[in-house]
């Protein structure tokens, strides 16, 4: 999300007014640019950061957070497994009904399986998107079309956010996955 209003709208649509957990995988415009606003607005109970900068360090002094290259956390009936190295940054979110694999820094992500695959900008080595029920590409508009073409040629059921709008994914306890494009 590149606008706090998009996050607020998504939270309002499910009747949520606070966050249990905020993951900040790394300091970059696409992954942490709204972190301070989100922390201030939604007061997450727990924050996990793969890395920080001076601005983030300042606010995290007063928050319940952990700076770690890996974590295995259970919150609100969901399980998050997170790992970052100099080659990759991934999270596996286990929810009732489905598992989502989120690849923040693509390089090599072997043996990672799930129902939903969320990618940033490139397809990492070691992942077969056709093995997922849904693939979402979060990339800039100029990069999205080339990567989308590759994903579609591999047989992936794929959506892109870059230049096309945000995607809402709802996972039901039955395992049914509903994907909607948000205005």
Where are the regions a protein language model picked out?
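Non-globular, low-confidence helical/coil segments that flank catalytic cores
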Residues: 1-183
